[in-house]
Amino acid sequence: QGGAVLSTSLLTSPNIEVDIKSKEVISSVGVTLEALRNEVLKQSNGKLFYPVDPTSRHDAYVGGTISCNASGFIPGESGATRFWVNEIELILPNGNLIKVRRGEHISSDTHFIILDNELEIKVPIPKYKRPDIKNASGPFSNHNGSIDFVDLIVGSEGIFGMLISCKLGLSKKPSNYLELFLCLENEDSAINFHDFLYKYYKKDMSQISALEYFGYNCQNYMKHKDFLFKNKDEV
């Protein structure tokens, strides 16, 4: 009953700081994703980049992308924010400030225990089965009740606490790449093409820098679609 909406757009500290050796970047939550990406390129002299690339990166804030586990053009798990979050700092509902590094706290017996002075707060772990498709809905779960605390926070939309800073992983920026626009006969052909790539790269789709699908509904909003597609069945 009731509640409050908190804006973190003014939380611009700490400053963005890139560690080239560890391929990580410290960031506040109140900067846009585009500002983060540009600063990473600047501090690394174009050698590193932050791969998560949603179409709203000019408007999306770093904290928001973590809260909803935003994803972009990169296929597979590495295209989602969760894959790159190495450390989080957040304020719990009881006012406690905690900093958690990935791998430090793994749930046991289907729950986490947070100590508040002498009080033990038990946080249950969702155990519902997640579908084998791209999915960013709800808190992260595992059928065996064992997950990393960082994964519980990423994508939970702030229900467990308020993010104030983070440490994100970076990737080496490709020096050479080839851009292709492939026109396929229909949606079934597109699925078959994806399956071919999945097998060719031995399930490691991160070897592809970006992969985007333009389906029938999307084409209705495209300019000059007749230049790209011969008929209404092509994708």
What label would you give each PLM region?
Residues 1, 53-63, 213-219:
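Short, glycine/charge-rich beta-strand/loop segments that flank catalytic centers
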Residues 16-22:
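Acidic/polar active-site rim loop that often engages polyanionic ligands
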Residues 22-24, 175-179, 234-235:
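Short, solvent-exposed beta-strand edge segments and adjacent coil->beta transition regions
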Residues 5-7, 26, 181-183, 210-212:
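Short, conserved beta-strand segments within well-ordered enzyme catalytic domains
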Residues 191-211:
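Acidic-enriched catalytic cores of C-N bond-cleaving enzymes acting on peptides and small amides
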Residues 204-235:
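Terminal amphipathic helices with adjacent charged low-complexity linkers/tails
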Residues 14-16, 29, 33-34, 38-189, ...:
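FAD-binding subdomain of flavoenzyme oxidoreductases
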